[in-house]
């Protein structure tokens, strides 16, 4: 019997969509040679809801809540991009107080996102304490969301021309009181993880991306900064009042999972710096005033005015039945969301509904590089790499 032994085949396994480390509904088809990953095939679309098409059938105000449901970890950052796009087409300037509140809540969203990511990344590699501490802080931030908008997650708080309602002084005081104790929690997380031998063994030199590769794959946000480029839209293309804020952009030099973790930790500290500056400016005399534009064709008139003026009542009725008419044109507006560059390409035909609203989600570009990042690593490293990409499926599948 000299039958030839059958050729060795690689082993194919499914990772997800029910896997606890798969962050939502990700399905990866992995080709393994023993423990070594030969190929990664991400299957997306399990959370596809047709958001871009739905937005075309809604007025600009009705389209706003769809943006909360993209990256549902930090909802207000997406609303920000959509508002900026519409405001640039309308050619309006948001009142200073409205801009300050927006920036304050965008940074709260950054804290929400980074807390979730850093602590679950630690959980993916076996550390169980950080998520418990991180979620305690996220709960406090969710309460700030709730007190501003009435909702913990899907806030629907930003408006074209500003924000929906002013913040009560007590809420501003409470956010101020949150800042310093929070920095202590970040330091505690730092002590738990940064020098931890096991955490470093699982993250150092894993998922390395050079700067050239990061640009070629269309990365943005932490993925680019981890590879050594100080690219942050808040600095390079400032929007709202970011030009006045003093903060540093942390960058890594190795482009591995560990550097990306360190950057997120430092970004949380910088976000608190920005929040403190916003609070200081909100309390200053030039920080008082309206939170939304006073043009009644764009923002609804005040209640008291509607009781006195017939015009105001008509404006209110037209705004909520027909909506804002945005001048014809096309524009791309991007914000530095916690996960990277979140962009909205808005095409208007002059009607009260967007003609087309293309959403550029940062997580989409990062997920497409899973194959390139994981090749040659071990199976156990896949979840570490996935954790450091910071992927949320709401925005990938849209």
Swiss-Prot record:
GO molecular function annotations of the record: NAD binding; NADH:ubiquinone reductase (non-electrogenic) activity; quinone binding
InterPro entries, per database record: NADH_Q_OxRdtase_suD, NADH_UbQ_OxRdtase_49kDa_CS, NDH1_su_D/H, NiFe-Hase_large
EC number: 7.1.1.-
Pfam families associated with the record: Complex1_49kDa (PF00346)
Keywords: Cell inner membrane, Cell membrane, Membrane, NAD, Quinone, Translocase, Transport, Ubiquinone
GO cellular component: plasma membrane
Compartment(s): Cell inner membrane
NCBIfam families per the UniProt record, alphabetical: NuoD, PRK06075.1
Functional summary from the UniProt entry: NDH-1 shuttles electrons from NADH, via FMN and iron-sulfur (Fe-S) centers, to quinones in the respiratory chain. The immediate electron acceptor for the enzyme in this species is believed to be ubiquinone. Couples the redox reaction to proton translocation (for every two electrons transferred, four hydrogen ions are translocated across the cytoplasmic membrane), and thus conserves the redox energy in a proton gradient.
Record HAMAP family: NDH1_NuoD
Subunit details: NDH-1 is composed of 14 different subunits. Subunits NuoB, C, D, E, F, and G constitute the peripheral sector of the complex.
Name of the protein: NADH-quinone oxidoreductase subunit D
Gene: nuoD
């Amino acid at each position: 019997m000299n039958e030839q032994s059958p050729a060795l085949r690689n082993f194919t396994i499914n990772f997800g969509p029910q896997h606890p480390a798969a962050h939502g509904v990700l399905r990866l088809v992995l080709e393994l040679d023993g423990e070594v990953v030969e190929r990664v095939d991400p299957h997306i679309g399990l959370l596809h809801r047709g958001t871009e098409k739905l937005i075309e059938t809604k007025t600009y105000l009705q389209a706003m809540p769809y943006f909360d449901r993209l990256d549902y970890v930090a909802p207000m950052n997406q609303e920000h991009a959509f508002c900026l796009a519409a405001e640039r087409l309308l050619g309006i300037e948001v009142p200073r107080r409205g801009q300050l509140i927006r920036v304050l809540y965008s940074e709260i969203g950054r804290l929400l996102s980074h807390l979730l990511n850093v602590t679950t990344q630690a959980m993916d590699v076996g550390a169980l304490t950080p998520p418990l501490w991180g979620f305690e802080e996220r709960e406090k931030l969710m309460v700030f969301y709730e007190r501003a908008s009435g909702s913990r997650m899907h806030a629907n708080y930003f408006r074209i021309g500003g924000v929906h309602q002013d913040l009560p002084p007590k809420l501003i005081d409470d956010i101020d009181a949150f800042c310093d104790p929070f920095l202590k929690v970040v330091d505690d997380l730092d002590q738990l993880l940064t020098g931890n031998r096991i955490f470093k063994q699982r993250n150092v030199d894993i998922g390395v991306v050079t700067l050239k590769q990061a640009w070629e794959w269309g990365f943005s946000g932490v993925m680019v900064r981890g590879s050594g480029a100080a690219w942050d839209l808040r600095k390079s293309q400032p929007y709202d009042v970011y030009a006045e804020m003093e903060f540093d952009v942390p960058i890594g030099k190795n482009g591995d999972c560990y550097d990306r973790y360190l950057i997120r930790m430092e970004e949380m500290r910088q976000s608190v710096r920005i929040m403190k500056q916003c609070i200081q400016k909100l309390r200053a005399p030039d920080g008082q005033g309206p939170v939304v534009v006073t043009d009644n064709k764009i923002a609804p008139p005040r209640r008291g005015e509607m009781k006195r003026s017939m015009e105001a009542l008509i404006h209110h009725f037209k705004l909520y039945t027909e909506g804002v008419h945005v001048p014809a044109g096309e524009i791309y507006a991007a914000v530095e969301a916690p996960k990277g560059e979140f962009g909205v390409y808005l095409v208007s035909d002059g009607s009260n509904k967007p003609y087309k609203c293309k959403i550029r989600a940062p997580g989409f570009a990062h997920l497409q590089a899973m194959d390139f990042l994981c090749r040659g690593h071990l199976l156990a490293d896949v979840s570490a790499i996935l954790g450091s990409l910071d992927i949320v499926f709401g925005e990938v599948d849209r």
